[in-house]
């Protein structure tokens, strides 16, 4: 099949029409990874790139947003003490991923506070707050706010989580940060619930996320 591949290179937009061409070779010869956002494309199966909105303007995400029923990809993130944290550390538990752009925004901060309150009464469930904020910011916020029922984690070092779960914003004012989303992983290690919040400035649906672990 034919695939349009769009790459944002500085201020130019390059549109490539794939007719069984070796696009990987084209990328290596003509495109620097440091000067563009590269959208991964599966040439065997159609890959649908998810989108969200920021203040009403469409924002593309890199990769494919994680789907219900799939085995949750493992990931490595950074804790407030700068040590590594992996999903496999939580085997046998329900896991709620509260994913957001930055704690420096009111909506993101509110989501952490609310999940912290809700997390206090959940059995066999761990809530993770994930963003690109530095661990120092996570530590400062959680200490100041008295956050005890949420584990704050940063994706600043490894940057494998954002691609595996399809939540990195590819364009717009917040390009490079994580989109607002909630993902629930069941005790069996499979994705039980997802919400890609359609508008970055809005809060997620907390009740539906909690219902997925009860």
Outline where the language-model segments fall.
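Chalcogenol-based redox active-site neighborhoods
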Residues: 48-214
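Short, contiguous, well-ordered secondary-structure segments
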Residues: 1-4, 188-190
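N-terminal targeting signals for export/organelle localization
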Residues: 2-7, 13, 17-18, 22, ...
């Amino acid at each position: 099949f034919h695939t349009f591949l769009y790459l944002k290179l500085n201020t130019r937009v390059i549109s490539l029409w794939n007719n069984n061409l070796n696009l990987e070779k084209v990328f290596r010869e003509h495109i620097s990874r440091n000067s563009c956002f590269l959208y991964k494309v599966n040439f065997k199966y159609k890959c649908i790139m998810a989108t969200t909105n920021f203040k009403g303007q469409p924002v593309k995400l890199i990769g494919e947003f994680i789907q219900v029923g799939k085995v949750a990809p493992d990931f490595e993130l950074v804790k407030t003490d700068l040590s590594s944290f992996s999903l496999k550390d939580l085997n046998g538990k329900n896991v709620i991923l509260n994913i957001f752009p930055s704690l420096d925004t009111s909506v993101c901060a509110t989501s952490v506070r609310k999940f912290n309150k809700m997390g206090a009464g959940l059995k066999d469930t761990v809530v993770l707050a994930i963003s690109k904020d530095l661990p120092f910011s996570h530590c400062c916020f959680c200490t100041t706010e008295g956050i005890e029922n949420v584990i704050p984690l940063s994706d600043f070092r490894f940057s494998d989580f954002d691609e595996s779960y399809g939540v990195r914003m590819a364009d717009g004012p917040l390009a490079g940060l994580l989109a607002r989303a909630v993902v629930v992983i069941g005790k069996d290690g499979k994705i039980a619930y997802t919400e890609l919040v359609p508008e970055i400035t809005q809060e997620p649906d907390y009740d539906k996320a909690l219902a997925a672990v009860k």
